[in-house]
Amino acid sequence: MAEKKMWGGRFKQGTATLVEEYTESVSYDRALYAQDIAGSMAHARMLARQGVLTAEEAAIIVDGLATVRSEIEAGSFVWRREFEDVHMNIENRLTELVGDVGKKLHTGRSRNDQVALDFRLFVSDRVRVWRELGRDLVGVIVDQARQHTATLLPGCTHMQPAQPVSLAQHLLAYAWMLRRDIDRLEDCDKRARVCPLGAAALAGTTYPLDPASVADELGMYGTFRNSMDAVSDRDFVLEALFDGSVIMAHLSRLCEEFILWANPAFGYIFLPDAYATGSSIMPQKKNPDVAELMRGKTGRVYGALTTMLTTVKGLPMTYNRDLQEDKEPFIDADRTVSASLEIMAGMLREVRFNTARMRTALRSGFLNATELADYLVGKGIPFREAHHLTGAAVALAEEKGVTLEELPLEDYRGICDRIDEDVYPILEPEAAVSRRETPGGTGPRSVAAQIAELDSWLGR
């Protein structure tokens, strides 16, 4: 077995079968094949420019790598466990195709800087997908908000009725969360897409390499300043997983609200059939399983972040085999984040809002109490006293089983003689919403400004 290993020259005994099974990574890092081939092509061209390879040798290698890529994409490539990982599988097949010239590809390069390059490109590529899926979801949210600027519902704190808000304002809160997420992803991409080539195993190389030209060819933002940092750094994975975790936290919050709102106790939404499931025993059930699963899958992404933090927390310089464990958590998290963003966009696009039920809910919970307190402030009463007087009015209305709009004027005047007939229009939900035109508030002009700003950001 030892002679089959590309590193096996000093070994007399082959790798134990169980060890081979335990240490292989090709079963999952084959996902990086496109980045590995792109990096190797750029490396070969650079070697030719630097006079390490001839132009003819580089062309043969690049053509051979293109053939390997075609085989992989056609499904005819045979992945072999004994070659351990994506890099050695591709290099072995390249050598089968082009002969000994293929063995020159690895000149000036170690798997340490090779895998760092591949994984940086892979994470960057996937983060860019998350970014575009996030932008698509923001667009869906903005479109829904545009249709519901006049739809009002109870805004809550502590899951208790607090103040009336527009449904548009409620939805736009998630758009702004996702915009921050996308900003973070753009920052992450800049730090991930940095070229580590030239570091070799850890100390650099004696060959006259030009990593900057490789970085340019691969659309990277620069090169590393320290070879030891280049091969050992996995900050970019941590950052991407943190960003993915925050995205999932935001999606999970929206899922939680959809789950609650779909319950007849709220009845605010009608879930589309395509995003719900039924019960094997209860024929009437329409379960929000998609939202529940997305809420549950959030933990998988958190787990991936925790796995990576634990993996790197005690590693001495420089590369350690522990770092092989960086790919599975990210690949799993990527599947979850990508699918969740796309599915949430589809679900939100098709969900129907029960605006009549939302309107009815505005009559419970004294959501206009703050309006009464502000009204009293306008009559010259200090806010703390106005707060106390409003509390007394709420208690009286609750005792009588009426809303603040229904409380008779004589009862109001028994609490404060400055209250007059002009209090009643102020207590209407539309009045409460329309008066809140502070920047970012739920007032119509503020909501319209938010929609316009997000439309501009989306390039509409």
UniProtKB/Swiss-Prot annotation:
Keywords: Amino-acid biosynthesis, Arginine biosynthesis, Cytoplasm, Lyase
Key word Transmembrane helix present: no
This protein's pathway: Amino-acid biosynthesis; L-arginine biosynthesis; L-arginine from L-ornithine and carbamoyl phosphate: step 3/3
Subcellular location: Cytoplasm
Assigned GO CC terms: cytosol
UniProt GO molecular function: argininosuccinate lyase activity
Keyword hit for Transferase: no
CDD domains according to UniProt: Argininosuccinate_lyase (cd01359)
InterPro entries with a match to the protein in the record: Arg_succ_lyase_C (IPR029419), Argininosuccinate_lyase (IPR009049), Fumarase/histidase_N (IPR024083), Fumarate_lyase_CS (IPR020557), Fumarate_lyase_fam (IPR000362), Fumarate_lyase_N (IPR022761), L-Aspartase-like (IPR008948)
Transmembrane domains' residue ranges: none
Protein name as annotated: Argininosuccinate lyase
Gene source species: Nitratidesulfovibrio vulgaris (strain ATCC 29579 / DSM 644 / CCUG 34227 / NCIMB 8303 / VKM B-1760 / Hildenborough)
Annotated gene: argH
